[in-house]
């Protein structure tokens, strides 16, 4: 055998470290999942014995490699040094998650052996024990430690990373949150939802009268306007949750009584809708209340698309009731448990509205199925436990007794144990052992334990646990009455037979205790007839599985009323005191004492109102109310363990702290000034309020060893004022620092979010000069009213668009388009604010939610299931589906909106989507009839026919039409198949030139790849090449395609092809011989299509008229400027003529002195 190897390697797909160990697999053995640690050494011995027997027949050693990592534990054969690993030859022996290894044992007698017990099948209670041998026994502790560490890491990952938003197991619905109501019970009558809606409408109406506001969208007609015609809709409670029955008046329709609705809380939704401290608060009730109701595997999530956070998270265990409205069938709600501030809990009903009744039916059905599946899975995952009557329990105790004994003593214990079996079982075991002829006592003991294990495992399959028998008998007692089922009788006989094996005293005590329990059950059934107010509660507590819960739960209804009502405790005790019988039964007394174990009763020191009965009884009842009202169902198990640990206490609640006689002697010595009586001790301190429990072994020293402690010096008012000022200043400083931190965190998150959005490779790198040109255009003041030169913009777009400015440039190009086409479109949508659209419910929610996961699944911004990216995308698509009722939502829109969302904010992306759909005319191809898409496919075929005839003939030869490969190009604008950098460049050109860019890009792509397409000779390879290979373009090819698009001009051809399509369609209708009905249908379809075409032509005519009007206005401006220029020219000519006259006059004047110059006398020269 090769020496053990220890190598560490890292997986490529995860950051987990996998550790490999070279071992020898001794063997394996399937065992029961209830196998305990004392049994495991005998199982290992059996595996080794079986391995030795097989080795004699076929001496082959199994060299294996055990791979340990947090993601899985894998055992596979070791190929050896000479052979190479081949997964086809060497398949893994077993592979499981490390958390399924629930027992590991190291053989102390032979340290080179160790074994692991792996859960294989939780349903059939099967496990497999694998035994390994290591060549180096010092490595065995390291191997066991590695397996345990991997299991620990895997369990932590399961806790911290639950599959909360898994597409496979979660279903999402859009609902409108109406409000919440605190109720006093975990279940409700059928009319609860309708009553809640009426209360919501009443409150909203009263608020509307005080401050006028629009009516909420969830307002529905009240019950007086619509009679109750429908039967009760679907309502159910989660199976497996313990429930308490309602009072009779509530079941008879007393929902309007003040006892059920404890409080109405619609105004403080933003404070109480969230369960827990780590979840962000949702929006205010007057803001967006639409939520995504997500049903997972074991929980319900309420996600706010507005805040992008989880607003509510409830486990199925916390939900006790779900119901649909009777009159308001488009509403539903559920009741769940929420923790209160004082450590207790209360029940809250959440009410929601859907778009229609069918959606509510689907939600209720999904909830019911999810509850059922979760209950089944939890039952399967529940850890198996041994009861006192389990056959394997006796084997467990036997293995515990013989643990550490030598062979002879072990043999004696086994012989004693065999005497408890039947004669037939003893004879069978004796014969089987003698057949194998063991060589020594140790082998004989191993064989006996092996046969005993097989015997007890067979018995365990038919065994009924104590708790299961009690539940079965209680359910049968409800249906049959006082009759016991046959299974309970058989179980009782089995229990008596097992008890008879013990001492006579123990058996008698157990029989007497069982008789007392039976008498207690009879007292329960008798009390049903005596007290009608306790009937439903007592009948329901008989369904509880454990005795402590059965005795702790039955309380009067007034205690349930205390969960949410504001009534006085004393009034409840007075009103219900005469209904109870005067003598308290022992079971009730025990129940009262048990409740005080976990609740110290000194908190009720204020004297209540005087009751009619004795004050002692009323006080005890008051204490019991407080202890039950603050006890959650999850605390009952803790309470049972405390009760079992501490045992029964004294008569009154205050005697639960009574000490043993040794402790009392110790306390007398330690505190001689105090009496040992606990009641007097408590009376002395009754004025101090609630005291913490004192350790019974702690000495009480009131004044300390050196006298009374020194009193604290009282501070003056000035010192107190300075302390308050210092605390206030510190708090103000802390608040300012928190605000600054929040601002810094928000700015950092924005930068990270923007960087995450723009995580794609740029096609045309933008130079600094081009970036400067764009920044200059974008920073122009009043740019939305200034027309820029189209040639300059074409040149800038052709040279590249900076990625971080792309969203702003798209808005700039949209503004220039509006300035160029100053005419109102006929089909412009209503100017509804984006925030108002988000407050409504859409009927297209299912299609949108399905496509969210398909839209850019590999991009980090959209990859998170129901993350910020997907929720923002959902908001945009939902708002557009509400704005454009004709189109609604169509596949492909999610990619268009996703590209816009990557480059701008949510609201800006919605505005740009409206621009593309209405102003650019994209919405025509998304209409339900898809006629425009058919025309586009015809236009693309004609372009191929005219520009690439050989490629067109090749595609036609194999019957490949454009609809097989080009439909996604038009519906998603290449975003579903091509890289994001290329798609961004396509969007740049669409904002600049319009929708004809899609034809240019498609024609350029097919033309540039024409030689490669012509090489394929069948339909599958051609379509696969166009869909898969062609989108994986290189950067050079992409940039070449973009440059070709800027040089193409096919606008006139596209118009001609569209007219040609309509003419051919009319000719085809006229030439085909049809029957009258078919011709009628054809004519109707033609009529409808012609009407749509007429509308389109009217729209185009309106566009042309708008253009004509704009041109006429331009001509008028030019004429007016021409007249102004003519007047200016006349003025300049007059001015010129005047200037010429002035020049002539000056010339004439300058010529006159020259004529008189000879007549002038020259002065004589002067002498020196």
Curated annotation (Swiss-Prot):
SUPFAM superfamilies: PH domain-like, Ypt/Rab-GAP domain of gyp1p. GO terms for molecular function: GTPase activator activity. The modification Phosphoserine is found at residues 146, 235, 237, 503, 507, 525, 527, 565-566, 570-571, 585, 614, 627, 695, 941. This is TBC1 domain family member 1. InterPro entries: DUF3350, PH-like_dom_sf, PTB/PI_dom, Rab-GAP-TBC_dom, Rab-GAP_TBC_sf, Rab_GAP_TBC_domain. Residues 203-238, 532-551, 564-587, 628-658, 678-717, 1145-1168 are annotated as: Disordered. The keyword Nucleus applies. The modification Phosphothreonine is found at residues 505, 596, 1131. It is found in: Nucleus. Residues 800-994 form the Rab-GAP TBC domain. Residues 246-404 form the PID domain. Its main location: nucleus.
